[in-house]
């Protein structure tokens, strides 16, 4: 696969809850082996914790520009992505397959991907990460649609 969107100088944030410590650690090592700088916003213990805290942390890190992109992992990917999506400017998408990850970047300009440590295995997770990092936002008609999504956020965020 061509590295259409990959920028190895990119700083990537990663967050997780207790259910995803092992997967997070493997993804961190994988990203480092590819030459990325990785910032850990997740827990490093198996003690039960609350995924919304970590979704907010990764959302804020991406929205502020502290990191360029984020990866969020909990049991299913759903809860942590919901929390991240509450942060202005975040477009977090749960991905359980590489195709969805690629389309999330190419068509939706997803700045955070999420997946479930209890849903997919580590090799699938690595493939998802690769597809997402290699993809590039296509712009054009997709940019207009992303703008529409962001307009929804602006209209409804302060209800």
Enumerate the predicted regions with their spans.
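Short, Lys/Arg-enriched N-terminal segments with co-localized hydrophobic residues
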Residues: 1-9
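A short beta-strand-loop structural module common to alpha/beta enzyme folds
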Residues: 37-48
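Helix-adjacent hinge/juxtasegments
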Residues: 54, 58-94
């Amino acid at each position: 696969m061509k590295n259409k969107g990959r920028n190895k100088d990119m700083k990537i944030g990663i967050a997780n809850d207790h259910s995803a410590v092992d997967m997070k650690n493997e993804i961190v090592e994988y990203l480092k082996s590819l030459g990325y700088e990785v910032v850990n916003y997740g827990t490093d213990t198996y003690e039960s914790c609350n995924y919304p805290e970590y979704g907010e942390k990764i959302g804020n890190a991406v929205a502020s520009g502290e990191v360029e992109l984020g990866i969020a992992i909990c049991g299913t990917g759903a809860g942590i992505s919901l929390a991240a999506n509450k942060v202005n400017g975040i477009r977090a998408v749960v991905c359980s397959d590489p195709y969805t990850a690629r389309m999330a970047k190419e068509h939706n300009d997803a700045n955070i991907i999420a997946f479930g440590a209890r849903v997919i295995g580590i090799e699938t997770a690595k493939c998802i990460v690769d597809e997402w990092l290699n993809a590039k936002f296509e712009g054009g008609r997709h940019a207009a649609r992303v703008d529409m999504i962001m307009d929804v956020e602006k209209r409804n965020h302060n209800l």
